[in-house]
Every structure is written in C-alpha cells, then in structure tokens.
C-alpha cells in the first residue's frame, strides 16, 4: 500500500518460521543474500546499515531497535548530495508475526518527504521482501527436503504395506493429495492403495529420482523416472509439491514428459 500522504506498507507471508527469517537480519552473509552482495547490517541499536545497488547508488542508516525473532527498526535514506530522501532521514520498521504456513512480514516505511513519489519505494520493498522470502523459505526446507523426496520415492517402491504407510506418513501432510494425468487421490490411505495397484500393474517397475530437488517459496520440484526390471526407462516426469514448514507435502502434482505411443489412460487398465 502506498498513500501519497503517508507511509509505504508491504505485507508478505513467507513459508518459514520467524527464527529462520530473523537470521537474515542478524547474519551478514544472509543479509547480503537478499539485500545485495555489498550490503551490511550491524544488528545492534546504533549499528550501521549500508545497502549498495548495482547502479552504484548507496542507501544508509542506523539500527534503532531490535527484538529477536520479532522486530527490527532502522533509519533509511540515500547517500550523496541532493537526495530527496537523505541517508537516515526516514524510518523502516519490520515486524515478524507467526501465522499458519509461516511468518507474516509487515514492513512500514515512514517519514518520506511529502512530495516523494511512494511507488518506487513500494516496488523496491516488494522486490526485497520477495528475495527474503525466497532465501528464507529455501533455508527452512533445506535440512529435510532431500529426505522428504527420498521418502516419497521409496514409498512408491515399497512392497510392504505397513512400511509404505510409514514412508507416506513422513513425507505427506495430513490430508495431503496427489494428482497426475491418471490419478486423483486424497490422503495417505488412498495414495497407499493407489501405489499398491500401480505396483501390481507395472510388474516390478521402480521410481527413481532425477536430479536434485529444488525449492521456491515453499514449493518443491523434483524429477522422476519409472524404470523397468531390465533398467529400461518406461516414463519420466516432474512432480511439483507444496511443503509445510516441516517439509511434508500438502499436495503433489505430477507432470509426465511426452513419450511416443503413450497409451490413453483407459487403455492402461
């Protein structure tokens, strides 16, 4: 929101816990990851703030207040003569609030001159918070992402029903759903039954991962290949999933790569 006579305000829900997000204000390497390589923030009252832009412009200010995992306030403006918003002349407050699905980040930029167009500041802060969200959400998932994808693939290959249920319980959130061109199931029970049917129909084919999984704003993408007993690749594709804060999938959607002479779904049964 940008009121010509008031502060600039931006809100964004990030798929990460407040403690994860707050590290991007207190750790120098993490701060530079979302604010730019030459950016510096000393996260103590009176600490220095410096943000360098690719154009050569530099923003500067001082930290005013810090509440761990919840709030940080700093002054803001631009270095150099003749700046409409001189360094340290305005104030930015950022509040982190835990919400379902992660953290709501509320940014308020106040003290801008009355004649200063707010649109550029609004666009700039939206861009910055998007970079923060990308980095923070990826870090939230990083410790468990490979394991969750591994459990998903292992569940499709597991012949023992009890063990299959255990694997799905680790990688699928309660009520999680799965969709692909021939499948629409809701919950671990339906998915386990579907996997059992696929195993019977495919005669020993196995699901293998292709490449490293990727995360973006709480979404996950990972490739797969269906491999026959003789190691022939029968099909390939990509799954896209939404993960909760523990890395379990709320939903998974599978996309198949084109294959010549692929049978229509009705011919597969």
Predicted regions and their residues:
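Hydrophobic pocket/interface hotspot
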Residues: 21, 31, 49, 63, ...
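Amphipathic alpha-helical segments
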Residues: 15-34, 169
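Glycine-centered tight beta-turn/hairpin loop motif at sheet-sheet or coil-to-beta transitions
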Residues: 5, 54-56, 230-232
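Short acidic-aromatic low-complexity motifs
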Residues: 15-19, 142-171
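A beta-strand edge to alpha-helix "cap/lid" segment located at domain peripheries
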Residues: 82-134, 198-269
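A solvent-exposed, acidic/Ser-Thr-rich amphipathic alpha-helical stretch
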Residues: 18, 37-52, 59-61, 67, ...
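Short beta-strand segments that buttress and anchor functional surface loops
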Residues: 49-54, 74-79, 221-229
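Short acidic N-proximal helix/loop "leader" segments that mark the beginning
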Residues: 1-9, 139
């Amino acid at each position: 929101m940008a009121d010509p006579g008031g502060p600039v305000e931006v809100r964004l829900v990030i798929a990460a816990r407040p403690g994860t997000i707050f590290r991007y204000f207190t750790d120098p390497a993490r701060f530079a990851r979302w604010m730019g390589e030459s950016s510096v923030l000393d996260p103590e009252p009176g600490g220095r703030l410096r943000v360098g832009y690719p154009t050569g412009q530099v923003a500067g200010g001082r930290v005013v207040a810090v509440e761990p995992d919840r709030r940080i306030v700093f002054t803001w403006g631009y270095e150099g003569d003749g700046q409409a918003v001189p360094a340290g002349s305005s104030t930015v407050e950022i509040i982190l609030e835990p919400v379902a699905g992660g953290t709501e980040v509320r940014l308020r930029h106040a003290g801008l001159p009355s004649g200063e167009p707010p649109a550029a500041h609004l666009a700039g802060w939206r861009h910055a918070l998007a970079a923060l969200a990308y980095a923070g959400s990826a870090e939230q998932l990083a410790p468990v992402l490979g394991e969750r994808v591994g459990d998903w693939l292992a569940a499709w290959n597991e012949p023992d029903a009890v063990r299959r249920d255990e694997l799905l319980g680790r990688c699928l959130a309660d009520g999680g759903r799965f969709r692909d061109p021939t499948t629409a199931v809701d919950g671990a029970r339906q998915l386990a039954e579907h996997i059992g049917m696929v195993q019977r129909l495919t005669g020993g084919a196995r699901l293998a991962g292709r490449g490293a999984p990727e995360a973006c704003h709480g979404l996950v993408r990972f490739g797969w290949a269906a491999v026959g007993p003789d190691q022939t690749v029968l099909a390939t594709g990509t799954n896209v999933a939404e993960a909760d804060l523990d890395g379990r999938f709320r939903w998974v959607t599978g996309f198949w790569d084109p294959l010549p002479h692929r049978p229509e779904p009705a011919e597969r049964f």
